[in-house]
Amino acid sequence: MQVKETQNEGLKRGYEFTLPAADLAAQVDAKLKEAQPEVEMKGFRKGKVPMALLKKQFGQRIMGDAMQEAIDKALRDHLEKSGDRPALQPKIEMVNGETWKEGDDVVVTVAYEALPAIPEADLSGVELERLVVEASEEQVTEALENLAKNAQSFEDRKKGTKAKDGDQIVIDFKGMVDGEAFEGGSAEDYPLVLGSKSFIPGFEEQLVGAKAGDEVKVEVKFPEDYGHPALAGKDAVFETTVKAVKAPKAAEIDDELAKKFGAESLDALKGQIRERLEAEYKGASRQVLKRTLLDRLDEMVKFDLPESLVEAEAHQIAHQLWHEEHPEEHGHNHGEIEPTDEHKKLAERRVRLGLLLAEIGQKAEITVSDQEMTQAVLRQARQFPGQERAFFEFIQQNPQAQQQLRAPIFEDKVVDHIVEGAKVSEKPVTKDELEKAIEALDQV
């Protein structure tokens, strides 16, 4: 195989590989001879089929295989010799593919962008600040009160009392669209908490002020994106009878409440709440610390970036943000989404940090264990209740999906590795100050 360089600009590489016709013919003959002892053909004993007949019968297929193997081997040898690591799969094209015939040399072009050499990052001088929040008694009490509210019961209000937001009303209702009842549009003794927004918009608001015994005609319009297409956008009337109006009664904050939530006592429940709150604060603090570290690394090291990686990342960012702004659109049945300059700037940062962290992780021999991958798959599978097995099979058969799960685990382990060697000071802050620091992350 002859190799000629055609491009070497920045990270872009181009080569022309030529496989002489004689070499290809020799490889085809060698493959046919290797297969000859096992070939059976009518009119011949096993292993006695003439080479000429074998070539006529199998030559084209064998030639295609030999051609592909030769090109693949030449590319592997070239990459090993040059030390290049392609950023993406090299683009391989046959120059004379349309006119090529047996006896001609095989000429292919190979083009790719090489990953850049990553300069050494001096991590010894990295200084970071970890925000520390301790759960206060007020925060624990507030969490307890929320638990008590969630465990609340309802008691009948005095006869004639008007219902207000937060009250529970017990109703019978019958819905009509175009004068006809529809499936799922009626119920009896239905408990509805006003203000819970569990019914379609406008329904609950019209029952505020109703009293037990009142009959109310509730007029609403189903949302355009309503889950039942036959009702979407339709006007509806619900004939509603209010049978009871009940006031919320928060549960007592005592040992009985604690037992409802699996704790042995109120003190034990308080301890669990404190641990949960501080775990949440630590998680949020880590986000701030990680962003600070990534900002430092981004400023610390500069190197050329493969345009193909930046372009792919920018398109992915643009696509993701577009879908976040258009949640009603599913799939990819939309026009081309062009990345903006902001998308490209963010893509450059992500690619640069991704390559740098990969280099640091490789030198530190950081890997993602099978156990860590299994835990990640389990966490993701919980988002698809009833379809866990199908999700597992999808991950097993999809290397790209595996990499999408592995990448953030690897990144976090590399970040932890850097933080362990950095000078980290702790700064006590309030919950509000931590929340402001988190909000600032979203604005960057």
From Swiss-Prot:
<feature type="domain" description="PPIase FKBP-type">
    <location>
        <begin position="166"/>
        <end position="251"/>
    </location>
</feature>
<keyword id="KW-0963">Cytoplasm</keyword>
<dbReference type="GO" id="GO:0003755">
    <property type="term" value="F:peptidyl-prolyl cis-trans isomerase activity"/>
</dbReference>
<dbReference type="Pfam" id="PF05697">
    <property type="entry name" value="Trigger_N"/>
</dbReference>
<dbReference type="GO" id="GO:0006457">
    <property type="term" value="P:protein folding"/>
</dbReference>
<dbReference type="InterPro" id="IPR008881">
    <property type="entry name" value="Trigger_fac_ribosome-bd_bac"/>
</dbReference>
<dbReference type="InterPro" id="IPR046357">
    <property type="entry name" value="PPIase_dom_sf"/>
</dbReference>
<keyword id="KW-0143">Chaperone</keyword>
<keyword id="KW-0697">Rotamase</keyword>
<comment type="function">
    <text>Involved in protein export. Acts as a chaperone by maintaining the newly synthesized protein in an open conformation. Functions as a peptidyl-prolyl cis-trans isomerase.</text>
</comment>
<dbReference type="InterPro" id="IPR001179">
    <property type="entry name" value="PPIase_FKBP_dom"/>
</dbReference>
<dbReference type="GO" id="GO:0051301">
    <property type="term" value="P:cell division"/>
</dbReference>
<dbReference type="GO" id="GO:0005737">
    <property type="term" value="C:cytoplasm"/>
</dbReference>
<dbReference type="Pfam" id="PF05698">
    <property type="entry name" value="Trigger_C"/>
</dbReference>
<keyword id="KW-0132">Cell division</keyword>
<keyword id="KW-0413">Isomerase</keyword>
<keyword id="KW-0131">Cell cycle</keyword>
<dbReference type="Pfam" id="PF00254">
    <property type="entry name" value="FKBP_C"/>
</dbReference>
<dbReference type="InterPro" id="IPR036611">
    <property type="entry name" value="Trigger_fac_ribosome-bd_sf"/>
</dbReference>
<dbReference type="InterPro" id="IPR008880">
    <property type="entry name" value="Trigger_fac_C"/>
</dbReference>
<dbReference type="InterPro" id="IPR037041">
    <property type="entry name" value="Trigger_fac_C_sf"/>
</dbReference>
<comment type="similarity">
    <text>Belongs to the FKBP-type PPIase family. Tig subfamily.</text>
</comment>
<dbReference type="GO" id="GO:0015031">
    <property type="term" value="P:protein transport"/>
</dbReference>
<dbReference type="InterPro" id="IPR005215">
    <property type="entry name" value="Trig_fac"/>
</dbReference>
<protein>
    <recommendedName>
        <fullName>Trigger factor</fullName>
        <ecNumber>5.2.1.8</ecNumber>
    </recommendedName>
</protein>
<dbReference type="InterPro" id="IPR027304">
    <property type="entry name" value="Trigger_fact/SurA_dom_sf"/>
</dbReference>
